[in-house]
A protein has these predicted regions:
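Short, cationic-aromatic polyanion-contact patches
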Residues: 64-83, 139-162
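Phosphate-centric recognition/catalysis
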Residues: 1-5, 9-10, 94, 155-181
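Short acidic, hydrophobic short linear motifs in intrinsically disordered regions
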Residues: 24-33, 107-117
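Short capping segments at the starts of secondary-structure elements
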Residues: 17-26, 38, 104-109
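Glycine-rich active-site/cofactor-binding loop and its immediate structural neighborhood
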Residues: 87-114
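Short alpha-helical segments that sit at the start of domains
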Residues: 1-13, 70-96, 131, 178
């Protein structure tokens, strides 16, 4: 059993690491913070307690695809947007349709995307999605020519604030979803 004072110290270490990290931290990342071996169950318990500690505050501890992070609660986003009045990037219909096909039907080839959309996929669309780190090549189809198979990345899931593809909104709502730049 962990002593109460020790629990507070451990939570403080987790809190400062999560608050100062630019990226979500995985369980493995957080386990490396401590010199003594810690069980994953203990770490999860500490994270649950930390989440409860922040329950009535302006920020919340959330789990996304690549780990855990602190973020502002949704009700404060309107105020924070005033600090950075930059407009959100508008993505073309072709970009959004291509991303939708990849997200919901992965793994897919460019040929699959072209067949579904009924038009050729502009290489710039694929490049834009890869530069944004929303899609990546995840393999090759075992057919002549071995075309690349595309799938979404953890960064894509993180930007949507979800942990897995099963949490994606219904397909018909996807293109209306606001995706942060």
């Amino acid at each position: 059993m962990i002593e109460t004072s020790n629990i507070t110290a451990l939570k403080n270490v987790l809190e400062v690491a999560l608050l100062t990290s630019h990226e979500p931290l995985s369980l493995d990342d957080m386990l490396r913070l401590f010199t003594e071996k810690m069980e994953r169950a203990t770490l999860r318990m500490l994270l649950d307690e930390l989440k409860q500690d922040w329950a009535e505050r302006t920020m919340e501890l959330v789990q996304v695809a690549s780990g855990y992070r602190f973020q502002a609660r949704d009700e404060y986003s309107v105020f924070l947007a005033r600090l950075n009045p930059e407009r959100q990037a508008k993505y073309s219909r072709a970009v959004m349709e291509t991303l939708e096909i990849i997200a919901y039907r992965q793994p897919v080839t460019r040929g699959d995307i072209e067949e579904i959309r009924g038009v050729a996929v502009n290489p710039n669309v694929m490049r834009q999605l890869q530069e944004r780190d929303w899609i990546d090549v995840i393999g090759q189809r075992e057919v002549p020519g071995r075309p690349s198979l595309y799938g979404t990345t953890k960064h894509f899931l993180d930007d949507l604030n979800i942990r897995s593809l099963s949490e994606l909104p219904p397909m018909e709502d996807f293109t209306q979803q606001e995706i942060p730049i």
